[in-house]
A protein has these predicted regions:
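OB-fold single-stranded nucleic acid-binding module
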Residues: 1-83
Length: 83
């Protein structure tokens, strides 16, 4: 489980990245596939709306180009109160 503030939201190809830091090779990120973006939006939670918000993400941290969790279900991401 990782908790923190989403610094930026970026899309590269079929993947959306929720970046917790400026350096993607060092800082933590959450990855969301294009297919999952549709599921987030259907649940009323656009990935872009998470920018500058505190979130908690559940999953396995992998080291692929930097530490990250790949989101496979909307329920893995929890928006926390405040910033």
């Amino acid at each position: 489980m990782v908790e923190g503030k989403v610094l930026s939201v970026r899309q590269a190809g079929a993947t959306t990245y929720l970046n917790f830091g400026r350096n993607w090779t060092r800082d933590f990120a959450v990855t969301i596939s294009r297919r999952m973006v549709a599921a987030f939006e259907a649940a009323g939670l656009s990935p872009k709306s998470l920018e500058n918000r505190r979130i908690r993400v559940r999953g396995f941290v992998e080291a692929r180009g930097g530490p990250r969790i790949e989101v496979l279900r909307v329920g893995q991401v929890e928006v926390l109160g405040g910033n």
